[in-house]
Amino acid sequence: MDLGLSGKKAIVCAASKGLGRAVALALAREGVDLVINARSQDALKATAGQISGKTGVNVIPIAADITTEEGRQAVLAACPNPNILINNAGGPPPGDFRQVTRQDWIRAADANMLTPIFLIRAVVDGMVERGFGRIINITTSGVKAPGVYPQLGISIGVRSGLTGFVGVLSRQVARRNVTINGLLPGRFDTDRLRENLVFAAKAAGHSSEQEAILARGAIPAGRFGQPEEFGAFAAFLCSTHAGFLTGQNIVLDGGAYPGLL
């Protein structure tokens, strides 16, 4: 299927590895030129070279802290008029909220709620004027099923704030073929998953290998998701075929979410 994205431009945050990298690669395979961002310059440059080598598209790596105004301006200067924005950021570390300081909460809100909102604010009006835009916020399936991740209360809390904001804005720009959706990953085979498994294993008093077995057993698909699967779905959500889908929070978790809605 031709996704109708060839020649378009995208900003992809936290794209040096994991789900962000998978989304960037999937978009590049559809002919999308990229500006990718992460903090680590070496890893980001390596990813840019790999994606460009595989797909032939233009990939500009901008190593910067996207949670700062300077970092956001650097990314936007490299791609001032994106057709696609992929908001993505690593969540705060797992833990008991009783041990979390006020500054920890502020950092989490800045990274996982305010930064995506500021990036959306910077690009959405241009998308409206051009009559095409796709914005995806990569959050967590915990937004819909918080009880599954008791150690991620901070992450779920601030990402839920972003989700509420998008629920309002997405309806305001839909008439101009600008969609804003949340992709809510469950357990995908990434570094972040492995960190969470180690934390959960320590809390439960068993090995991370045993924790991984238990985690897979809670997924009807019987396995962890692969980043490539996530990237392919995100690319479709950015496509010209997905213009009637907006304001939604779509869970990709192998069937683990127990609800109907």
Where in this protein do the model-derived segments appear?
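Conserved NAD(P)H cofactor-binding loop of Rossmann-fold oxidoreductase domains
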Residues: 88-94, 255
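A short, exposed helix-loop element centered on a Lys and neighboring polar residues
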Residues: 120-121, 167
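Substrate-binding pocket helix/loop in short-chain dehydrogenase/reductase
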Residues: 96-97, 104-109, 215-216
